[in-house]
Structures are given as C-alpha cells and as structure tokens.
Amino acid sequence: MLALTHAHPDHMYHADEFQTVCLGKADIQAWKGPLKLATDVLVGLRKLPKKKFPVETYVPVTGHTRIDLGGNVIEVIEAPGHTPGSVLYVDHKHRCVFTGDAVGSGMFVLMALPGCLKLSDYRESLAHLLKALEPVSDYRMYGGHLNQEHGAGERGESYYNPVTIEVVQDLYTLCGKLLQKEILPRGKGFLCAQYGRAEIQLRRDQLR
C-alpha cells in the first residue's frame, strides 16, 4: 500500500508499483483539471518519461479515514492548500506526522502551482490544521523533501528549520498579515514572503 500526501509527480511518480494507492478525495476530484496540468509541467521540467496516472482507481481518503496497518492505525488529517486534497498522516504508535508539502519542509511552502488554493482559503485550512495538530504537537514531523529542511534568511543565509507546530503557527500568521497588507511580498513573477520560521511562495492572483 502507498499513502500519498498529494497528487504531484515528485510524490506519486512510482505509484504504479503499488497495488493499492490512497490519495486525498479532493485531489482525485480535481485531477482532470489543474492538478494534471501541474503534473505535466513538473514531469516536463524534470525531463521524466511521461506516465499515465490512473487516479480514478486510487482509494480516496478524508479526515474520517483510518488506515489499519496490522494494528497500527494511521489517522488522516485534511490540509488543503498546496493541492486541493493535501493530507497529513499521523502515526500514533511511532509518534510522528508525515506532512508532505502541506506546510513546506523547512523552506517555503510552494503555493504558486496550478491547483493551489487562494491565500484566504489556505489560511482557513491552516486554522483547522492547527486545531487538529494540538493533540500531537510534540510528535516529530516529517516533511516531503529532505533537501528542503533548511530555511533562508533575508540575506540568503541558510539555517536548520525543521517542520514543527511553530512553523504552522507562523504560516497562519503570515497569511493573515499578507491579506491585511501588513507584510508586502517581494518578487515580480512568483512572490515570496516570510514571517518568523515560515515562508511562502505564491502568485499575485492568490492574494485574496
């Protein structure tokens, strides 16, 4: 079994090697639109052979889903934003949470791809996520990209920035400050903004 955090090719490219594949219900529903477009773009950028992803055959998961791995029951938390159906997986037995790309992996959370939610919707999603993470705030969190475990300061200096509940809290605050124009994003194409330990990259049309 493969449990995907979201439908992007850098996470699902080898999904065809598994008999059972789980994916957020909203990602399955959005596949034929912006998510497939984002996948085609990312596959092209990485110069990978094209593949067909039979997403319609994947097992949909929601916040009510529990995955029983032989007595180790994995809890699902919905966290739309990076994709419409992004999810986190909570392993209570090993006291860890797999966050995928929902809140970044130390570097910025990427919200500029086709299918990413607008900022106000992402902020609302983060509010629900913070509440869901309260009981497991002391669990170790594993992001989706090891090579992105470092943040970067205003002058480009890198620092170790592991995914924690504090990063999610700072992301929520950052979204609010961007919407209230208390923080102005920098950049001309993709925009970037930073607050505390959180950083976000998004498009100008998402600032609403």
Question: What are these model-predicted stretches?
Answer:
Residues 1-10, 22-25, 78-81, 98-100, ...:
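Active-site neighborhood of phospho(di)ester-bond hydrolases with catalytic His/Asp-centered motifs
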Residues 11-14, 30-32, 106-108, 149-153:
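Short catalytic/ligand-binding loop motif for oxyanion handling, primarily in non-cytosolic enzymes
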Residues 1-68, 166-167:
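Active-site HxH/HxHxD metal-binding segment of metal-dependent hydrolases
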Residues 8, 27, 108-109, 113, ...:
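Flexible, active-site-proximal loop/turn residues at the rims of small-molecule/cofactor binding pockets
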Residues 14-17, 34-36, 92, 111, ...:
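Short amphipathic alpha-helical segments
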Residues 25-27, 34-37, 41, 80, ...:
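Short, flexible active-site-adjacent loop segments at beta-strand->alpha-helix junctions, enriched
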Residues 127-208:
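Accessory terminal helices/loops
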Residues 13, 52-124, 128:
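Catalytic core of the metallo-beta-lactamase
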